[in-house]
């Protein structure tokens, strides 16, 4: 995505999602979807989120997931240079959690898993493509 392994701001995370989309445009598809997760500092603690960028027929739409606060132990590890997934593994004594249910799944006890977490933002990013008369 041509950004940091752990995007550290809203802007950097959106840039990563946009770069991911640019990198797949040469493939044959009707829709292109990219996702980039990141963190941003809010009141001395990090919160996590992701950007979704979708393109279809030269039109681009973007949507952001809900944000959620990260535990202070994880925030401190991120400040030390760890990626969120690695910080999760350390704090929660797991392995490869970012490829499973991620921080959102761990922190919500899987009430919201990664698929659910991203799906609302994907649906929201699709709005301009499903309501073409309005966009």
Q: Which residue ranges define each predicted feature?
A:
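Anionic-ligand binding patches
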Residues: 4-135
């Amino acid at each position: 995505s041509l950004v940091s392994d752990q995007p550290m701001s809203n802007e950097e995370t959106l840039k990563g999602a946009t770069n991911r989309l640019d990198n797949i445009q040469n493939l044959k598809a009707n829709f292109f979807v990219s996702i980039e997760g990141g963190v941003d500092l809010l009141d001395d603690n990090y919160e996590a989120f992701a950007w979704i960028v979708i393109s279809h027929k030269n039109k681009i739409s973007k949507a952001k997931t809900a944000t959620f606060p990260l535990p202070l132990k994880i925030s401190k590890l991120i400040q030390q240079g760890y990626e969120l997934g690695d910080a999760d593994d350390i704090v929660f004594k797991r392995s490869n959690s970012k490829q499973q249910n991620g921080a959102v799944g761990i922190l919500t006890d899987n009430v919201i898993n990664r698929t659910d977490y991203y799906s609302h933002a994907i649906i929201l990013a699709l709005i301009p493509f499903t309501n073409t008369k309005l966009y």
